[in-house]
Amino acid sequence: MRVRVIDLDGSITAQDRVLRTFRPDVYDLRRWGPRVRLACRWKRFYRLERRLDRDFGPTDHHDSWISLLGSGDFHHMTLALLRRLRHPFNLLVIDKHPDWLRGLPMLHCGAWLQHAAKLPQVRRIFHLGGDRHFDDARRWLAPRRLIEANKIVVLPAVRRFDHGFWQDLPHQPLRRNLHTPIDRDRLEELLCPYLDELDRLPLYVSLDKDAMWMPESLTNWDSGHLDLNEVQEIMQFFLKAAGNDLIGMDIVGDWSHVRTQGLFRRFLRRLEHPRHKVDADQARICNERTNLMLLRFLKHDPVAESITFPSRLKSA
């Protein structure tokens, strides 16, 4: 897989070791960053989408990319990458937040997933590692029908969700308990009903590093529970189940100074971002180290050949 940087905030282009090691294609979209950060009107999103289409050229299933997008404030740009794909695929999302809020009049970084679920090429969505804003008051904005129909399969990080409609839905956390790391046996147990389907279609992965705990990611949001080994365990399992057919991937969750354009985005920033002080150099070093390990894992050893799955995982 090739690596590209969609540079909206300068967070990735500041990571010299990533640039030197992987020599990604860099697309300078810094001018767009303040105008789409956190949210944007659909008209603006379509203009940016056309710009990406011109820059990237035609989509080729045999030429898949790992796209680095910078801050999680730009996670809604994943939708533009998904809309470029023409063949059916399953979507794996690893994220602390649901990102599926309904009813918003604009495209928001916390709402893109419910739009992705409507794309005809997206067959099933697996949302893993979530913890925050699932069963609080925002549950009323969740795409309940899609979740109940298993169009979106939800596997929280460490706990069951216990308010509202979640009480009636079967869902189990990735960890058996708070202190037991995720392993292949646990993933097999949780995902066994979907293994044949995963085997039939290619996979797209969208990773927000806010699902990871603080020592391994410093984001513009709050941090999650998973460590890097667990994230790699999850990706390795899904890749193996999909026959290593990875149609594309994007990574968000780097930290950057927040620069927004317009009163509404400034309001969103104050309303939604946690107010904690972050040392910019520390954030860059931390996220660069994690990005390097993720990219090495994906490019050099995406699936450990020594791992053998039960025979039913290999059935067509």
Question: Where would I find each of the regions flagged by the language model?
Answer:
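Catalytic cores of soluble, metal-dependent hydrolases
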Residues: 1-69, 73-90, 121-124, 133-134, ...
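Conserved residues at the C-terminal ends of beta-strands
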Residues: 94, 128, 252
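Distinct, well-ordered alpha-helical segments
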Residues: 139-143
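Short, conserved active-site loop motifs that form the nucleotide-linked donor/cofactor pocket
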Residues: 147-153
